[in-house]
C-alpha cells in the first residue's frame, strides 16, 4: 500500500525545533497531573492540622476516609475524562478538545484553592468537587497528548518524543515539591515558627496556594496549544482533506518540499484506480474486535495491572519517610508538610526522573515490548525484596539505606518500563479515527487500577490485629507487597502473550497490517483517504500549500 505523500513526509522529517516545542506544550497536562497527585500528600498534612485539631482519636491528622476521598475523586474524574475527551478527540478533532481540557484543568485548580465554606464538611466537599473536575481535565489530556505527539512525530524517534512528553510528570513532581517547600518555609518563618500543636489561622491559606499554583504552568501554555494546527493525520485520514493537511504541516515543519509532495499526491490520486470505500465499522463492532480487540485488551489490561502497584507504592512512601523525620507531634504543620515534600523530591531525583530519561534513550532502540516486560519483571523483584523480610526486619529498620534503595528502584523500574510504554502503545496501534478513543479507554482502565491500588492498599496494608485508627483490619504490609509483586508478574505474562512491537513502524503500517487480515466492508482509513475527492482543492489552487511560515 503506497502511503499518502504528506504522511510519508512526516515520517521522514528530521527532528527540529517544533518537535521539542510540541513536547513541552503536550507535556503540560502530564505535568499538572503529577503536580496534583504529589502535592495532595503534604497538603493533607496541613488540612489535618487546620480542620481536625479539635479532639478525636488522633488530633491534627486527616481521617483515612477523607484522604481516600480526595485521592479517589480525582482518579474517578480521570476515568471519565479519558473516556469522554478521548472520544471527542476522534469526533471533533484533537486541537479543539485539547484547549478545552487545559481550561478545565486551570479552572478546577483555581477552584480547589477557593474551597471556602463556613463548616469543615462543606469546605472538604467543595475541595473534592473541584478535584473531581481536575481529574476529568487531566484524564482527557492523556489520550490527546499522546495522540497529538504520535501524529506529529517521525517514525524514527516517535517513541522517544512520546516518552519525553510523559517524562514531564517527573518535572511536575519536582515542581510540586519545590512549591510546597517554599510555601511551607515562608509561612513557618512568617508566623515565627509556631509550636507543634499550635496551627496559625493562615495555615488555611497555605494549602490553597499550593493547590492553585498548579494552574500557572498550564495557563501559560494555553496560547501555544490553541496555535497548534490540527494534526495532519487527523485531517488527512479522518476529515479526508489531504491538501489541508499538507498546508497545516507547511506552517510548522521546516525543510520539507511540501509543494512537491502535494503536486505528486494530486497527480497520483487522479491516476490511480478508485480506492476501496472508507471502512464503515464502528468502535467495538464485530470487525473492530477482530482487528483491534486484542491490541485494546493488551493496552488496557497492562495499564490496569501497572497502576495497582504504582499508585500503591506512592502511598507506601509514608512508611518510609516516617522514621527519617521527627514525629508529627514534635513539629508544626508547615514543617510536617515540608518534610513530606522534601522526601518526594529526593525520590523523584533519585529514581523517577532517571527512569524516564532511560526510557527516552532506549524506547526506540530496545522497543516498547521488551522495555515493558523488563520493567514489570524488575518491579516484581524489588517488591518481593521489600516484602520477604518486611515483618522480620524492614518494619523495624525502615530508615535503613537498603530499604530506601529498593523502594527507589521500584519507581525507577516502573518509569523505565510499563509506566512509559503503556502511555505510548495505545497511541501507535489503532487507526486514526479510533486512536484517541482507544487511548482513552486504555487510560481509563489504568485509572481504575489506580483506584484499586490507592484505596485497596490503604486497607490491605493494615495488620489483621491492631489496624490504624479509622482502618479496617487487612492482610498486613508484607502480604500486600507480595500481592503487588504478583500483579507485576501477571503484567509481564500478559505483555509477552498479547503486546505487539511498534518500534520503527509508521502508524499507517500498524493499521494496514490489521486491515489486510479482513475482507469486505472497505479497506483501511489510509487507502480510503487517497481518493480524488479528498484532493478537493485539486490543481486549481495549489498556492495555499506553501504559506508563509508561522511561529506556533
UniProtKB/Swiss-Prot annotation:
Expressed at low levels in roots. GO terms for cellular component: membrane. It is a multi-pass membrane protein. GO terms for biological process: phosphate ion transport. Pfam families: Sugar_tr. It comes from the Eukaryota. It is found in: Membrane. The chain crosses the membrane at residues 23-43, 69-89, 97-117, 124-144, 159-179, 204-224, 296-316, 343-363, 370-390, 398-418, 440-460, 474-494. Gene3D superfamilies: MFS general substrate transporter like domains (1.20.1250.20). Residues 1-22, 90-96, 145-158, 225-295, 364-369, 419-439, 495-552 are cytoplasmic. Coiled coil: none annotated. Its main location: membrane. Residues 507-540 are annotated as: Disordered. Residues 44-68, 118-123, 180-203, 317-342, 391-397, 461-473 are extracellular. GO terms for molecular function: symporter activity. Keywords: Membrane, Phosphate transport, Symport, Transmembrane, Transmembrane helix, Transport. High-affinity transporter for external inorganic phosphate. Although related to the sugar transporter family, it does not transport sugars. Belongs to the major facilitator superfamily. Phosphate:H(+) symporter (TC 2.A.1.9) family. This is Probable inorganic phosphate transporter 1-10. It comes from Oryza sativa subsp. japonica (Rice).
Amino acid at each position: 500500500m503506497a502511503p499518502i505523500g504528506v504522511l510519508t513526509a512526516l515520517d521522514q522529517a528530521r527532528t527540529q525545533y517544533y518537535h521539542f516545542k510540541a513536547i513541552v506544550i503536550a507535556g503540560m497536562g502530564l505535568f499538572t497531573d503529577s503536580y496534583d497527585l504529589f502535592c495532595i500528600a503534604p497538603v493533607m498534612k496541613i488540612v489535618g492540622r487546620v480542620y481536625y485539631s479539635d479532639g478525636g482519636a488522633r488530633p491534627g491528622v486527616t481521617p483515612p476516609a477523607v484522604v481516600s476521598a480526595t485521592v479517589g475523586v480525582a482518579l474517578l474524574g480521570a476515568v471519565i475524562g479519558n473516556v469522554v475527551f478521548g472520544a471527542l478527540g476522534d469526533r471533533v478533532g484533537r486541537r479543539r478538545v485539547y484547549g478545552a481540557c487545559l481550561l478545565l484543568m486551570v479552572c478546577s485548580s483555581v477552584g480547589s484553592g477557593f474551597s471556602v465554606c463556613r463548616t469543615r464538611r462543606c469546605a472538604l466537599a467543595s475541595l473534592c468537587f473541584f478535584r473531581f473536575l481536575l481529574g476529568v481535565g487531566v484524564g482527557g489530556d492523556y489520550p490527546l497528548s499522546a495522540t497529538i505527539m504520535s501524529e506529529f512525530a517521525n517514525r524514527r524517534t516517535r517513541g522517544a518524543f512520546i516518552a519525553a512528553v510523559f517524562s514531564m510528570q517527573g518535572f511536575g513532581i519536582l515542581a510540586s515539591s519545590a512549591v510546597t517547600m517554599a510555601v511551607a518555609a515562608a509561612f513557618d518563618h512568617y508566623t515565627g515558627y509556631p509550636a507543634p500543636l499550635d496551627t496559625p489561622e493562615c495555615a488555611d491559606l497555605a494549602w490553597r496556594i499550593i493547590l492553585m499554583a498548579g494552574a500557572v504552568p498550564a495557563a501559560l501554555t494555553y496560547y501555544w496549544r490553541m496555535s497548534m494546527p490540527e494534526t495532519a493525520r487527523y485531517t488527512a485520514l479522518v476529515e479526508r482533506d489531504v491538501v489541508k493537511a499538507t498546508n497545516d504541516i507547511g506552517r510548522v515543519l521546516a525543510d520539507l518540499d511540501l509543494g512537491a509532495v502535494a503536486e505528486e499526491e494530486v497527480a497520483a490520486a487522479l491516476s490511480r484506480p478508485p480506492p476501496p470505500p472508507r471502512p464503515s465499522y464502528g468502535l467495538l463492532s464485530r470487525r473492530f474486535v477482530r482487528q483491534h480487540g486484542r491490541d485494546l485488551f493488551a493496552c488496557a489490561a497492562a495499564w490496569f495491572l501497572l497502576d495497582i502497584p504504582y499508585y500503591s507504592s506512592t502511598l507506601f512512601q509514608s512508611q518510609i519517610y516516617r522514621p527519617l523525620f521527627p514525629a508529627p507531634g514534635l513539629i508544626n504543620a508547615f514543617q510536617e508538610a515540608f518534610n513530606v515534600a522534601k522526601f518526594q523530591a529526593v525520590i523523584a531525583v533519585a529514581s523517577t526522573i532517571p527512569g524516564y530519561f532511560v526510557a527516552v534513550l532506549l524506547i526506540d532502540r530496545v522497543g516498547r515490548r521488551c522495555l515493558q516486560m523488563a520493567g514489570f519483571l524488575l518491579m516484581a523483584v524489588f517488591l518481593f525484596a521489600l516484602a520477604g523480610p518486611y515483618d522480620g526486619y524492614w518494619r523495624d529498620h525502615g530508615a535503613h539505606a537498603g530499604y530506601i534503595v529498593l523502594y527507589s528502584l521500584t519507581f525507577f523500574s516502573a518509569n523505565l518500563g510499563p509506566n512509559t510504554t503503556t502511555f505510548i502503545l495505545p497511541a501507535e496501534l489503532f487507526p486514526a479515527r479510533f486512536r484517541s478513543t482507544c487511548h482513552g479507554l486504555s487510560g481509563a482502565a489504568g485509572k481504575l487500577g489506580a483506584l484499586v491500588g490507592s484505596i485497596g492498599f490503604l486497607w490491605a496494608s493494615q495488620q489483621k490485629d491492631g489496624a490504624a485508627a479509622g482502618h479496617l483490619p487487612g492482610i498486613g504490609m508484607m502480604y500486600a507487597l507480595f500481592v503487588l509483586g504478583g500483579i507485576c508478574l501477571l503484567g509481564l505474562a500478559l505483555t509477552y502473550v498479547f503486546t505487539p512491537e511498534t518500534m520503527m513502524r509508521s502508524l499507517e503500517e500498524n493499521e494496514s497490517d490489521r486491515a489486510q487480515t479482513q475482507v469486505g466492508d472497505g479497506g483501511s482509513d489510509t487507502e480510503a483517504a487517497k481518493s480524488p475527492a479528498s484532493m478537493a482543492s485539486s490543481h486549481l489552487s495549489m498556492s495555499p500549500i506553501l504559506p508563509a511560515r508561522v511561529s506556533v
